[in-house]
Amino acid sequence: MSSQLPILTVSQLNRQVKGFLENEIGLVHVEGEISNLSKPSSGHYYFTLKDSTAQIRCAFFKNRHSSSLLRNFNDGQQIVASGKLSLYEARGEYQLIVEEIVEAGMGILYQRFEELKIKLAREGLFNPERKKTLPRIPETIGIITSPTGAAIQDILSTLARRFPIARIIIYPSEVQGQAAPQQLVNALKLANTHKRCQVLILARGGGSIEDLWAFNDEYLARQIAISEIPVVSGIGHETDFTIADFVADYRAETPTAAATAVTPNCIELFNILDTAIYRLHDAIIRLVKGLQLKLNHLIDKIASPRQTISTYWQTLDYLERQLISAMTQFINLNINKMNLFSTRLQANNPKTQIERTKIQLRQLILQLTQEIRIKVNQLKHQLSTNLSTLHAVSPLATLDRGYAIVSKNQRILFAAQQAQIGDTIDVRLAKGSLACEVTQIKD
């Protein structure tokens, strides 16, 4: 016995072999016949996979499968088991820890699926950056599916509940069989030619891999990728994945989930509407305050009421008309939008909410109009008062009381000594002026 090699216990040896099997050998696919199938109450499944010359023990643990998965598999059935090798240390038996089971013959389909998936991924068809954003509130929704399947009923009922005002266009197509891929492609092309939809739902109900195989077609995948309209896939159940799911702009777990993904909720729309009304009211208040500041600024800049009062009156009247007109147009525009929502939402009868909003908007118009006119009248009254005050202290008002302003060579005289006998002086009266000659000077 060589002294160079360490002496291992059985446990150590089995542990090393187990580590090698689990870490060095990756996922394997093994085809064989089921025998000695055991289904204990723990939920785990144990069986032997064999061919004509060899066999291997297999373990399919509960957390790897659904409870109903192996009900369709029995002793003597040919399957393909996918999993990783391990070692049961207590008995030194190596085994296959199964992760997935399919019927024999299905392995070819999975291989084709993986090859196409890798090919399209390398071309960038699955990249998130090339995927289009879904519209927030689509007016028209296109549905590509069988018109007689369960999927279309699930989609229509969900759309009717969540967003009944949306228009629906159904592009009928087979979703299973040899003709299905080309029909699905034609439906996608037709929807893009019409350009009437803001989003498309590509859907069908659940089924086996053969049932869903039409959605693994390469030509269909490329058509989804070049679609100008965002495509939402809702194919099969949550655990089903197709090539179309990877290429679609959004993958939903089921047809119902796809309908939910493309629609807002009516309650959310009402919240948006309430927010818009609040912002409208706030914008009008800011507009009024801004115009008030502008008017105050103009008033402060008045230099001579006699020269500018007429212009300011006209400006004030013009601003009043412009403000009322702009406010009325703004409110009427939103009333028109409210009327449009009222028409589309008749199916859900939100009439009371809409009428209440209309009344609030009309009251807002009347209230703001009245407040603006009151403020304008106050400003007019203030201007009139200021004008009267300025006139009262004006030198011209003194002339009205019988006084005169005497000037010589356009310079006002304050004392008799500023003039000489023979000078010509101007005497300005309240009405008119006199040119007088000085004949006598008195102290």
Curated annotation (Swiss-Prot):
<dbReference type="GO" id="GO:0009318">
    <property type="term" value="C:exodeoxyribonuclease VII complex"/>
</dbReference>
<dbReference type="GO" id="GO:0006308">
    <property type="term" value="P:DNA catabolic process"/>
</dbReference>
<dbReference type="GO" id="GO:0003676">
    <property type="term" value="F:nucleic acid binding"/>
</dbReference>
<dbReference type="InterPro" id="IPR012340">
    <property type="entry name" value="NA-bd_OB-fold"/>
</dbReference>
<comment type="subunit">
    <text>Heterooligomer composed of large and small subunits.</text>
</comment>
<keyword id="KW-0378">Hydrolase</keyword>
<protein>
    <recommendedName>
        <fullName>Exodeoxyribonuclease 7 large subunit</fullName>
        <ecNumber>3.1.11.6</ecNumber>
    </recommendedName>
</protein>
<keyword id="KW-0540">Nuclease</keyword>
<dbReference type="InterPro" id="IPR020579">
    <property type="entry name" value="Exonuc_VII_lsu_C"/>
</dbReference>
<dbReference type="Pfam" id="PF13742">
    <property type="entry name" value="tRNA_anti_2"/>
</dbReference>
<keyword id="KW-0269">Exonuclease</keyword>
<comment type="function">
    <text>Bidirectionally degrades single-stranded DNA into large acid-insoluble oligonucleotides, which are then degraded further into small acid-soluble oligonucleotides.</text>
</comment>
<dbReference type="Pfam" id="PF02601">
    <property type="entry name" value="Exonuc_VII_L"/>
</dbReference>
<dbReference type="GO" id="GO:0008855">
    <property type="term" value="F:exodeoxyribonuclease VII activity"/>
</dbReference>
<dbReference type="InterPro" id="IPR025824">
    <property type="entry name" value="OB-fold_nuc-bd_dom"/>
</dbReference>
<keyword id="KW-0963">Cytoplasm</keyword>
<dbReference type="InterPro" id="IPR003753">
    <property type="entry name" value="Exonuc_VII_L"/>
</dbReference>
<comment type="similarity">
    <text>Belongs to the XseA family.</text>
</comment>
<dbReference type="GO" id="GO:0005737">
    <property type="term" value="C:cytoplasm"/>
</dbReference>
